[in-house]
Amino acid sequence: MSDVSGRFVVAAAVVAVSLAMAAAAAAHDYGEALSKSLLYFEAQRSGRLPYNQRVRWRGHSGLTDGLEQGVDLVGGYYDAGDHVKFGLPMAFTVTMLSWSVLEYGEEIAAAGELGHALHAIKWGTDYFIKAHTHPNVLWTQVGDGDSDHYCWQRPEDMTTSRHAYKVDAENPGSEVAAETAAAMAAASIVFRRAGDAHYAHLLLHHAQQLFEFGDKYRGRYDESVEVVKNYYPSSSGYKDELLWAALWLHRATGRREYLDYAVDNADDFGGTGWAVSEFSWDIKYAGLQVLASKLLVEEKHLSSQQREVLEKYRSKAEYYVCSCMGRNPGGAAHNAGRTPAGLLFIRPWNNLQYVSNAAFLLTVYSDVLSYLSLPLLCPDPDAAADEAAPAAADAGEVLEFARSQADYILGTNPMATSYLVGYGEAYPRRVHHRAASSASYARDRDFIGCLQGFDSWYSAAAENPHDLVGAVVGGPNGNDVFTDHRGAYMQTEACTYNTAPMVGVFSRLMELERRRRGEDAPPSSTSPVAEDDL
């Protein structure tokens, strides 16, 4: 059974795991965190803002994007605290938002946030439809990172280059084509479930074309669009994105050809070979390994070969989970780093992106373990082939670890600081973000020049005029220390792909808390959202 015939229903075993975690549950308001996370995406919007825009200190921006190239590229998201629209991280953001809704849509609906979640996804997919102007053409970037970083302006005042860049048959970009295909395929399932069959079909049509384009004309996108190399280079190549997109297309269509692609190319493309400790906009292996593992739960008519290969994917998914939890034999070489207070620590620059992605994958994988009634296994690579690996953790422990990472983000940390802006009493007040750090365009329309903003806003010791509510910033250093200063951009800049996976995590934990308190599910509606509202 594929996602075509219905969503993956969390089994009774998952409920039992949730109840068993009652004693360890934290006193955080995950519903509030969820609501604020979704609000953040409205602050990152580019283009003509809708009448129901909730972040009122933002205005229309980028209204001539694509004009120079004769294509309409108005819309989409700014990735972080600047104003370039980077296609690869934007697509990954939409994929993770969609996956969050697919896994925990009922919980999101119960919180009254399903409409906002669909809006957030559609703001991205509407842009991707515009950017995919031909079966073998995808516009992947608007703006220039170098000139953009030279200025500190509100997006409404931009004077920097809005040159647009594309990939095509002569200048391929398999990573961005495949990731955009994955995003549109995942979103198509979301909107089909929401009752918008026409829009779902349109997204799926684009997703299939983009996958075919990325697979037929293979090449690294940062070699075709070289200006992206200083910002979003591809370190893992494009094979992980191709496998990732194929699995999403299988879930969206139920067609065997996409599953066969992921099975037949599993070894050659590294899907069953790469054992990793990170999941990000660049390196998709852990994500596709968890996604493949879910097929063992959802698919009822797998061939023996398919099941064998999917089990290989699952073994690598377990390596990732074991690495995050520090359970892999072999010490530091096989396990993700930690701060003294227990936060996963992969890199100093924007470390919380890796934490939020890990929290999401571990949350999803704990549900897989519950359904299969299996423990987490962390085998010793030096053990004999016939030596069974001991159980390293159960599903409840995996979910508990994911919760610990979410709670750290929400303020259970040595700094007693929430790294989700706007949550709690103490949170970053000087986020590295041009719009949030400047006067509201809605109240003060006096033009802010390119360099003027550095003197007036960037260098100021004062707090930002606007809280970037719902943003997950880069986070503390390896010693759990955080510096709340705009110049400390490795720690204070937030990105869309930091927050996107937390939508799913907060939704799952919100439901966990409800069960802990023994409450009935609140009345909710998963009925279709009116097309006019989207």
From Swiss-Prot:
It catalyses: Endohydrolysis of (1->4)-beta-D-glucosidic linkages in cellulose, lichenin and cereal beta-D-glucans. GO terms for molecular function: cellulase activity. Residues 1-27 form the signal peptide. The active site is at residues 82, 432, 484, 493. Keywords: Carbohydrate metabolism, Cell wall biogenesis/degradation, Cellulose degradation, Glycosidase, Hydrolase, Polysaccharide degradation, Secreted, Signal. GO terms for biological process: cell wall organization; cellulose catabolic process. GO terms for cellular component: extracellular region. The keyword Iron does not apply. Residues 515-534 are annotated as: Disordered. Its EC number is 3.2.1.4. It is found in: Secreted. Belongs to the glycosyl hydrolase 9 (cellulase E) family. This is Endoglucanase 5. It comes from Oryza sativa subsp. japonica (Rice). The lineage of its organism: Eukaryota, Viridiplantae, Streptophyta, Embryophyta, Tracheophyta.
